Amino acid sequence: MQVENPIVSLHQVEVNFDGYKAVNDVTIDFPAKGVHFIIGPNGAGKTTILDVICGRVKAAKGKVVYQQKREIQNLKPEKIVHMGISRKFQNPTIFPTQTVYQNMKLAIISGKSPFWYLVQTKLTNKQKHKIDEVLDSLDLLLYKSAISGSLSHGQKQWLEIAMAIINEPDLLLVDEPIAGMTPKERNKTGELLQKIGQERTVFVVEHDMKFVKNFSSAVTVMHEGRIICRGDFADVVNNQEVIEIYLGRQE
C-alpha cells in the first residue's frame, strides 16, 4: 500500500521482551489525517507499536521516522511529546480531585514549567480560550467547574482526550478508548475521534470490530508481532488470513 507524505514510518522495527518478539521486523508507512485502527488478537503487538512511536518502549532494531525527516526511536518520551505526538492510555490518567478546568490547565502548560509550579502558573487569555474551545468540541464545556472524579467513565475518557489534544499534536495515539463505555458513549467517542481526525492523525488500538467498522479511515491488522494486512475495513474483513487468524476467533 503506497502512502504519500506519511506522518510516521517504521522501518524493520523489532521489539523483544525477555526473548519474545513483541514486534517482529515491522515496516509500514502511516498516512496523515484520519482515524487509523490497529487490530489483532491479544499479544499481537498493537499497543507495543504505539509504545515505540511515543518513546515508552525502545526498539531493539529498526527506525521510526516522524514526518519524513526525524528519527525518533532513541528520543525520550517528553521530547517526542514536544515534537507533536500525544498518547492517551486505556485507563484515564486524569487528576480526579481537580476540576475539569484544572486538569486542562495542567495539560496546557505541562512541560513548560516545573510540575510543582504548575498550579501557580497563570494562563494567558489565549490559553483560556483554547481550553474552552477544546472542552466545547468534546461536549465538556458545561462540566468545566466539575470535579473530574465525579464525571462518568465516558466523560473521563473524553477529558483525557481533551488533555491530549490541547497542545495541538499532529499525531494522537489512543489505546482501547471505548472499554467500559455504554453504547451511547461508544458512538459519541467514535464521532469525537472522527472530528479530531479531520485535522490531525489518530491511531487507535481497538478490539471492538463494530466500532472499527463504523469509525475507521483505514485498518492495520497485526498477528504475532507482524503486520498481515492493511486497507479499508472491507479489505480487511475479506482477507482470508485475517478471517482465519483474527475474525474467526470472535464467532
What residue spans do the PLM features occupy?
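The feature captures the beta-strand-to-loop junction immediately N-terminal to the Walker
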Residues: 39-41
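Helix-to-loop junction immediately C-terminal to a conserved catalytic motif
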Residues: 54
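ABC ATPase NBD Q-loop/coupling interface
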Residues: 63-82, 122
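Conserved ABC ATPase "signature" region
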Residues: 116-143, 191
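Catalytic Walker B motif of ABC-type/P-loop ATPase nucleotide-binding domains
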Residues: 172-176
